[in-house]
Amino acid sequence: MAKGQSLQEPFLNALRKEKVPVSIYLVNGIKLQGQIESFDQFVILLRNNVNQMVYKHAISTVVPARNVRTAPPVPTETHAQSSEEFGNI
């Protein structure tokens, strides 16, 4: 799994499972609204009055109507930790 997917997948999956209404802003400024029906590596299927397949490369921002609970983040090494290990380079 690519590093970018490790944040995307739990977030989109929580929105899908909880049927949270979302606003999706495209890079051209268009705002789409609905619920995430499904998604894969390249597209999000958005449901409102009709189903829309939205390509992820066209998406700027996904804004949920409410907060969602996702899986806890995987701890990563901070810059301070790595500096200490290497003698404060």
Curated annotation (Swiss-Prot):
Homohexamer. GO terms for molecular function: RNA binding. SUPFAM superfamilies: Sm-like ribonucleoproteins. Residues 70-89 are annotated as: Disordered. It comes from the Bacteria. Keywords: RNA-binding, Stress response. This is RNA-binding protein Hfq. RNA chaperone that binds small regulatory RNA (sRNAs) and mRNAs to facilitate mRNA translational regulation in response to envelope stress, environmental stress and changes in metabolite concentrations. Also binds with high specificity to tRNAs. The keyword RNA-binding applies. InterPro entries: Hfq, LSM_dom_sf, Sm. It holds the Pfam family Hfq. One of its GO terms (biological process) is regulation of translation, ncRNA-mediated. PANTHER family: RNA-BINDING PROTEIN HFQ.
